[in-house]
Amino acid sequence: MSPPDRAAEGGITRAVPPVSRPAWYALERGGWRDYVTLLHPPYTAWHLSYVVIGGCLAPVGAWERLAPVGAWGRLGAATAAFALAVGVGAHALDELNGRPLRTKIPDRVLVGLASVSVLGACAIGVVGAVTFEAWLALLIPIGLFLVLAYNLELAGGRFHSDVWFGLAWGGFPVLCGYAAVAGDVRGVTVLAAVFAVLLSLAQRALSSHVRHVRRRVSAVRGELELTDARREPLDARRLTAPAEAGLRLLSLATVVLAATMIAFRI
């Protein structure tokens, strides 16, 4: 974005439009680009990393008991389930509910994507419960509830809050990843889930500010007066750049942490 125009006299900074894209990772609208944007790629990778982290925290005994192929298979299945439920299903429902990403994807396509992906995730869960541990079936309705309640803002949006975001997309993936490999839940699972919840809350704090500026602010005006009497123009990019840089780095760091834990297990 170019710097804001200044009046010929008085040094008054005119209002300038904010950044045009609804999200820092959003592509130009139309065609296949809408579907890429719909996936929220950096955030989806971030939250899938929680599943991997949880699975890799399972005790050595669980990995030995299942044999490496079996353990990796279960962790892969859990990750695939979350990729469907969160990466596709939840985001399709979110876009259906108010078009926050401003895509041109038809409503019927969004409904189809959400239905097929969420049902696919549930099917993976059922297979896991039948072939591994029956109690894992309890996680299926919990996950289904979280996807629907959060993204459709059920109960007047009561579940569409910072805390529920941290629990649903931070703590729950860690728990499921661990349970998929270990077949149970232990103290270390709770600690890792707390880590994921707190990190997700940090994500939410940064992303909420960015969303507000990108999607709700129509113009920005003003300037910063520095201690040395210099003045710098204030625009939307200055308001969002620090938070977006933090989000980029945190998403990358979480993916690298998950990759590190995979390498450790290998």
Task: Cite the ranges covered by each PLM segment.
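Intramembrane alpha-helical segments
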Residues: 107-181
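Membrane-interface module
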Residues: 182-266
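Helix-coil boundary and interhelical linker segments in multi-pass alpha-helical membrane proteins
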Residues: 52-80, 122-139, 173-192, 262-266
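Cytosolic, membrane-interface loops and tails of multi-pass inner-membrane proteins
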Residues: 13-33, 89-106, 203-241
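Alpha-helical transmembrane segments and their membrane-interface exit regions
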Residues: 83-90, 142-152, 194-204
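Multi-pass membrane catalytic core of lipid/isoprenoid biosynthesis enzymes
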Residues: 33-38, 42-55, 74-81, 87-136, ...
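N-terminal transmembrane signal-anchor/hairpin module of polytopic inner-membrane proteins
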Residues: 3, 11-38, 43-44, 71, ...
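Transmembrane helix-loop junctions in multipass membrane proteins, especially transporters and channels
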Residues: 59-63, 94, 98-102, 133, ...
